[in-house]
Curated annotation (Swiss-Prot):
Location of region: Important for dimerization: 240-275
Organism: Salmonella enteritidis PT4 (strain P125109)
GO molecular function: coproporphyrinogen oxidase activity; metal ion binding; protein homodimerization activity
GO biological process: protoporphyrinogen IX biosynthetic process
The gene coding this protein: hemF
Record keywords, A-Z: Cytoplasm, Heme biosynthesis, Metal-binding, Oxidoreductase, Porphyrin biosynthesis
Name assigned to this protein: Oxygen-dependent coproporphyrinogen-III oxidase
Subunit structure of this chain's protein: Homodimer.
Family: Belongs to the aerobic coproporphyrinogen-III oxidase family.
Active site per UniProt: 106
Pfam families per UniProt: Coprogen_oxidas (PF01218)
Site description Important for dimerization, residues in chain: 175
């Protein structure tokens, strides 16, 4: 079937609405919407919830950009795309809670198509979801990964193991030699066996995010925390910033295509701290995190 970018866009707009509504229902605060246009073509709508009852900052961004030439970040590993016009659309979100016992979560789903006269379009889907805890709870990790596995199951037994490994490999801070969190799913360049199958999988990932995350929020939101936990949360948020600015391909793509900087950097935590050569106290809950985020089979 010929790729149908219009249907993908309509799903993404509905997905943004659905996720924002569910996050607001849990938090009690509302999102503020900021619609924007891109001079070179396209635009989007960024929605941010700040200083809510549970979420310090939650950003859910929809973007749809297009142009006459591919950016360098996209053609570096796909040289056959040079000289093609392109459309890129997606929903990307990051949620940073107040409570350090609630993990930070990230998800995104996206569609890309590049065309030129006289040639078949080149298209693919990408996306995923991943979880970044500050204090590890095994039941939360198991729930997160079980939900990820279950949404993959209709598409084949090998889908979850493959995309879990890809997620573990992708969200790795090489300069720190550590994982960003406990992973989840990551996929890119998905265009087989056909458009309908790939689109259905992308929808399953997008719709699965709130099923994976919100039960964890409900389970942890009443836990009492203090200055010690907050300081550790801010310190670990530094790793999040480092990954996004140094390693994340999506951030690089957005900046290279003249995307909207405020929306691209919306994933950044509102507060963060670095401390030179800080080490957690041996045997402490903070020290346990480094072991908790090691790659493993959670289910």
């Amino acid at each position: 079937m010929k790729p149908d970018a219009h249907h993908v866009k309509q799903f993404l707009l509905r997905l943004q609405d659905d996720i924002c509504q569910k996050l607001s229902a849990v938090d009690g605060a509302n999102f503020v919407e900021d619609s924007w246009r891109r001079e070179a073509g396209g635009g989007g709508r960024s929605r941010v919830l700040r200083n809510g009852g549970i979420f310090e900052q939650a950003g859910v961004n929809f973007s749809h950009v297009h142009g006459d030439a591919m950016p360098a970040s996209a053609t570096a590993h796909r040289p056959e795309l040079a000289g093609r016009s392109f459309e890129a659309m997606g929903v990307s979100l990051v949620v940073h809670p107040h409570n350090p016992y609630i993990p930070t979560s990230h998800a995104n789903v996206r569609f890309f198509i590049a065309e030129k006269p006289g040639a078949d379009p080149v298209w693919w889907f990408g996306g995923g979801l991943d979880l970044t805890p500050y204090y590890g709870f095994e039941e939360d990790a198991v729930h997160w990964h079980r939900t990820a596995r279950d949404l993959c199951q209709p598409f084949g037994d090998n889908v979850y193991p493959r995309y879990k490994k890809w997620c573990d490999d992708y969200f790795f801070l090489k300069h720190r030699n550590e994982q960003r969190g406990i992973g989840g799913l990551f996929f890119d360049d998905l265009n087989t066996p056909d458009f309908d199958h790939c689109f259905a999988f992308m929808q399953a990932v997008g719709n699965g995010y709130t099923e994976a995350y919100l039960p964890i929020v409900e389970r942890r939101k009443a836990m009492v925390w203090g200055e010690r936990e907050r300081n550790f949360q801010l310190y670990r948020r530094g790793r999040y910033v480092e990954f996004n600015l140094v390693w994340d391909r999506g951030t690089l793509f957005g900046l290279q295509t003249g995307g909207r900087t405020e929306s691209i950097l919306m994933s950044m935590p509102p507060l963060v701290r670095w401390e030179y050569d800080w080490q957690p106290e041996a045997g402490s809950p903070e020290a346990a995190l480094s072991e908790f985020i090691q790659v493993r089979d959670w289910i």
